């Protein structure tokens, strides 16, 4: 057996408590524990007979004196610490009763994930804090279907509605045509603080934007993470998550969840199928296919980070 296989896996429930303004609660580890003084998300070990929701409710009551509502699945990943090999079940919590307060001598702070963070951070908390800055809505361009002018007009409407990430994915357009789209989309996205990514089909334009979305073929053939602030991947099956993790991809897009004009019912995962797929990701996953931004809450209950939708939705 390998060293990791030979070690006992400790199952841990992790609470990501999010206020309406996007601030997230962190706590530092008390004296006497490994990594004392390091900041982390609250939570703790899942005891025999508990599920993740039950364990998290108990831990957050014991640590913070609060009663939580539904804890929405976000992702699960494993981390190998010198003192323990842990499987971390991250759950986002938007609803709780009572004011979080220290019951175990730990310091607490609500922080902006995109701002200055307390230091030092527990290693397994670093990537999730960065992932929290990803918007819950990913707008996918469809210039090939709706035309350049209609796309830009609708993009302004969608960006005004709230935080979003724009993905320019135009396999039918030439590089020159995509560059013309970017020339108009970039200033609008910058004005709203919206990151913009481009499909790896037009990877030559990636230096102009904030990141790259790898196609399944490019994900399989890549030997290293592309040099970009954000790197995403389109996923068609659970077996591709291994390649995504190996490259250090930040998020995946998976679907189709529901039937659409482009994708028939026979290929749709359904919400249960999507939830089963997302549970294996180890990173944030956007639900795609037959969805609108109004499906965001349903998607998050199924384990999605958010939804990937056409920028032309009304």
What are these regions (language model features)?
Residues 2-25, 76:
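Conserved N-terminal beta-strand and adjoining loop/helix that marks the start
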Residues 23-63, 75, 195-197:
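Conserved Nudix-box catalytic region and its N-terminal flanking loop in Nudix hydrolases
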Residues 77-100:
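Active-site-adjacent beta-strand/loop module that shapes the phosphate/pyrophosphate-binding cleft
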Residues 101-155, 161:
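Nudix hydrolase/Nudix homology domain
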Residues 135-142, 166-168, 196-198, 212-214, ...:
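Hydrophobic faces of well-ordered beta-strands that scaffold small-molecule active sites
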Residues 144-158, 200-203, 237-243, 292-297:
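Short, acidic/polar
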Residues 179-198, 216, 223-237, 265-290:
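Alpha-helix-loop-beta-strand connector modules within alpha/beta enzyme cores
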Residues 212, 216-224, 251-265, 290-314:
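Glycine-rich phosphate-binding active-site loops on the catalytic face of alpha/beta enzymes
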């Amino acid at each position: 057996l390998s060293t990791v296989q030979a070690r006992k896996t400790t199952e841990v429930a992790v609470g990501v408590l999010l206020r309406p303004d996007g601030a997230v609660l962190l706590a530092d580890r008390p004296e006497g524990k490994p990594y004392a003084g390091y900041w982390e998300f609250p939570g703790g070990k899942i005891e025999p007979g508990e599920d993740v929701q039950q364990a998290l409710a108990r831990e957050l009551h014991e640590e913070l004196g609060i009663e939580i509502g539904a804890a929405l699945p976000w992702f699960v990943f494993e981390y190998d610490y010198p003192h323990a090999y842990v499987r971390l079940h991250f759950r986002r919590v938007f609803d709780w009763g009572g004011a979080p307060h220290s019951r175990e001598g730990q310091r607490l702070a609500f922080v902006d994930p995109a701002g200055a963070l307390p230091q030092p951070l527990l290693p397994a908390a670093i990537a999730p804090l960065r992932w929290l800055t990803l918007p819950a809505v990913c707008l996918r361009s469809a210039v090939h279907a709706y035309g350049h002018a209609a796309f830009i007009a609708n993009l302004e409407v969608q960006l005004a509605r709230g935080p979003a990430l724009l993905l320019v994915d135009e396999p039918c357009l030439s590089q020159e045509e995509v560059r013309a789209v970017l020339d108009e989309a970039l200033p609008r996205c910058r004005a709203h603080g919206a990151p913009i990514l481009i499909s790896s089909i037009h990877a030559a334009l990636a230096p102009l934007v904030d990141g790259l979305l790898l196609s399944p073929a490019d994900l399989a053939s890549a030997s290293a993470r592309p040099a970009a602030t954000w790197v995403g991947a389109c996923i068609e099956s659970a077996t591709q998550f291994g390649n995504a993790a190996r490259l250090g991809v930040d998020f995946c897009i998976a679907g189709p969840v529901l039937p659409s004009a482009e994708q028939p019912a026979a290929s749709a995962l359904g919400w249960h199928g999507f939830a089963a797929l997302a549970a294996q990701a180890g990173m944030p996953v956007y639900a795609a296919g037959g969805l609108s931004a109004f499906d965001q809450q349903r998607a998050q209950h199924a384990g999605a980070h958010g939804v990937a939708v056409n920028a032309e939705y009304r």
